[in-house]
Amino acid sequence: MDTRLIAIATFVVTFGILIVLKRLNYIESWDTFSILSILAAVLTIAAYFFTLVLFPQDYDQLKKEILDEINESLKNYEIYFKCKDFKKPIVKDGAVRIDKCVVMATKLNLTDHGYIVDLKFRSNWMDSKGTHAILFIDGDDAQINLFEREGEIFYIIKSKNKISGVYIQLKSVKWFDEAFSDNWNNIKIMWDTSKDEIWLEINGIRVSKKLNFDFNLNDSVIYLGSNPLEDTYAEGYFDRIMVYKSADTADFGTPTVRRFE
């Protein structure tokens, strides 16, 4: 139990006992009652700080518990997301909130099927210090805010029930293909929800024409990739986008593939 709650409960019980003793005339004067009440408050505060020194809270353990809870809750979400509805927020437990529907590719995996990008979702949100958010996850009991500052990657974990503001510096981001290392913060998938159009931008320049889909992109999983059978594969270019339409992340279903033009 929280030490502060114990201290408050102790004072309330002590004060209640003093009131009972006064009503039973064991404490005759109000002056004596006032002095004893003040003494009880002082002793309670002293005991509270003594307890903090004698039994310090294990913040590392609490931090680990939060991380474990978050990792467990995120196992089933992979790169699943829902776009934010502007009439009301639509945020599934552990899912990613994308402000203005802008996401960022930050990690490249080289597979037998070509380059597959695990999307690290990005919003346009800037905090008071001007750092740019990379990932924001909002769950029932905790929030994760991953962001970049001066080339280093950090994340803050906030929990409603435990620690608020655990601030952790991550190891530097490693790219699987160094050819893409200069594109950090510069590759964006742009999505116009009103028209269900999606396109790719690098360094703010639109490098592909709009791609029209015959279904709503909500509840979709998006991959960027390249074809290992084409020359562009060796040069590390993205040449296609894959959209998995499924409401359940455990079953991605059949991908819809569109090439960049």
Curated annotation (Swiss-Prot):
Keyword vocabulary terms for this entry: Cell membrane, Membrane, Transmembrane, Transmembrane helix
SUPFAM superfamilies, per the entry: Concanavalin A-like lectins/glucanases
Transmembrane segments: 4-21, 33-55
Cellular component terms per the entry's GO annotation: plasma membrane
Domain of life: Archaea
Membrane-topology annotation of the record: Multi-pass membrane protein
Subcellular location: Cell membrane
Record flagged with keyword Amino-acid biosynthesis: no
InterPro entries hit by this protein: ConA-like_dom_sf
Protein known as: Uncharacterized protein AF_2291
Organism annotation: Archaeoglobus fulgidus (strain ATCC 49558 / DSM 4304 / JCM 9628 / NBRC 100126 / VC-16)
